[in-house]
UniProtKB/Swiss-Prot annotation:
InterPro entries to which the protein is assigned, alphabetical: AceTr (IPR051633), Gpr1/Fun34/SatP-like (IPR000791)
GO cellular component: cell septum; plasma membrane
Family that this chain belongs to: Belongs to the acetate uptake transporter (AceTr) (TC 2.A.96) family.
Coiled coil: none
Disruption phenotype: No visible phenotype. Does not affect growth on ethanol, glycerol or acetate as a sole carbon source. Does not result in phenotypes related to possible secretion of ammonia. Grows normally on media with low concentrations of ethanol. No effect when screening for allylalcohol and n-propanol toxicity. AlcA and alcS double mutant has no difference in phenotype from alcA single mutant. FacA and alcS double mutant does not differ from a single facA mutant in its ability to grow on a medium with glycerol as a carbon source either alone or in presence of ethanol.
Gene from which the chain derives: alcS
Pfam families for the chain: Gpr1_Fun34_YaaH (PF01184)
Major subcellular location class: membrane
Keyword Cell membrane attributed: yes
Lineage: Eukaryota, Fungi, Dikarya, Ascomycota, Pezizomycotina
Name of the protein described by the UniProt record: Protein alcS
């Protein structure tokens, strides 16, 4: 208690205490960090900021315009070559930074998710940059990246990367069932994205433009759904972060899996 002298009178004021750390419940932890709470909450997580919204922000800023491009809205084309900058600095870099921060906090699952998806964005952008010379050898002149990106041999080859990413998304999908419904649906949407992209590239490689283009547009639609779910999850986390009296449900899936403590 402190004492203040005003006009010869003493006035007492009680000091207020501001908590320096907050302990989260298992459900709150899984909603904010997108990772099952497998052990006691680390002390560092109670003192520092939550990095997960940073990755979600980078994800939605990248996937939303790219999905519109894949669906050819407003005459857009190029399979995302116009978004090389955002793909590198928003999709790749922000997810990589978040992956490192999640590693420091001990959150293995989001660390792996954000790190691998961020790495994919870097690789995807690098393929379209002429200085990497990834697509140019597939062109008839062996020097044109633009022509190489649309060549049959390149598409037939690059589709294997999408198939591999689809397998990875399936693994993430299974792991995400320990967290919440929204996060699980994001990986389900991404699984469809990579399956449709691989199918589209193989059909285009075979010269079947009609089916190939439909598959690419279907991949764009699935990616758009994933971006909308990402926006929802981002809003839910930021509302909690600033203490708004609005709680958006994300569908906690604890009822399907028993919690294990380590």
């Amino acid at each position: 208690m402190t004492t203040e002298i005003s006009n010869g009178e003493a006035k007492g004021h009680h000091l207020s205490t501001i908590p320096s750390s907050i302990t989260l419940s298992a459900e709150q932890f899984e909603k904010l960090y997108l990772s099952p709470m497998m052990r006691q909450q680390p002390s560092l997580a109670r003192k520092v900021g939550n990095p997960t919204p940073l990755a979600l922000g980078g994800f939605v800023i990248t996937t939303t315009p790219l999905s519109c491009c894949l669906m050819a809205w407003r005459g857009s084309s190029g399979n995302g070559i116009a978004f090389i900058g955002p793909i590198i600095f928003l999709g790749g870099l922000l997810l990589l930074i978040t992956s490192i921060l999640e590693f420091i906090l001990g959150n293995t699952f989001p660390c792996v998710v954000f790190g691998t998806i961020g790495g994919f964005w870097f690789a995807f952008a690098a393929t379209m940059i002429p200085s990497f010379n990834a697509a140019a050898p597939y062109s008839s002149s062996a020097t044109s990246t633009t022509a190489g990106l649309t060549s049959a041999s390149f598409m037939n080859t690059y589709a294997f990367l999408f198939i591999t990413m689809a397998v990875l998304m399936l693994i993430f999908l299974l792991c995400a069932t320990r967290t919440n419904v929204v996060y699980t649906l994001i990986f389900l949407s991404l699984l469809l994205v990579f399956l449709l992209l691989s199918a589209g590239y193989w059909r285009l490689g075979e010269g079947d433009a009609a089916v190939g283009d439909r598959c690419i547009k279907g991949a764009g639609a699935s990616l758009f759904v994933a971006s909308l779910l990402g926006f929802y999850l981002l809003i839910a986390q930021l509302f909690d972060a600033v203490g708004l009296p609005i709680t958006l449900p994300v569908g906690d899936m604890e009822r399907f899996w028993p919690r294990s403590q380590k």
